[in-house]
Curated annotation (Swiss-Prot):
Record note on quaternary structure: Part of the 30S ribosomal subunit. Forms a bridge to the 50S subunit in the 70S ribosome, contacting the 23S rRNA.
Xref: PROSITE patterns: RIBOSOMAL_S15 (PS00362)
Gene Ontology CC terms, in alphabetical order: cytosolic small ribosomal subunit
Record family assignment: Belongs to the universal ribosomal protein uS15 family.
CDD domains: Ribosomal_S15p_S13e (cd00353)
Species of origin: Exiguobacterium sp. (strain ATCC BAA-1283 / AT1b)
Protein name: Small ribosomal subunit protein uS15
Length: 89
């Protein structure tokens, strides 16, 4: 269910704005998106796992807040990130 260390490092390397960048909104949103997609697949097979469903909703809310922050801070970075991740915004 959780991301492997290798997969998380791949995502960080792909979306980092500079070397060693793990805290930028782009990286955080990309990692959250991967976790959300993984959890969505889990919930498709385990429909009654309400505990994980609540965790999914919390992750979606955190991602929404980060995207709102990025949109207010820099619209071009926001649009580029949405396009790269394939989010419907």
């Amino acid at each position: 269910m959780a991301l492997s260390k290798e997969r998380k490092n791949e995502i960080i390397a792909e979306y980092a704005t500079k070397q060693g960048d793990t805290g930028s909104p782009e990286v955080q949103v990309a990692v959250l998106t991967e976790q959300i997609n993984t959890l969505n697949d889990h919930l498709r097979t385990h429909k009654k796992d309400h505990h994980s469903r609540r965790g999914l909703l919390k992750m979606v809310g955190r991602r929404r807040n980060l995207l709102t922050y990025l949109r207010n801070k820099d619209v071009t970075r926001y649009r580029e990130l949405i396009q790269r991740l394939g989010l419907r915004r």
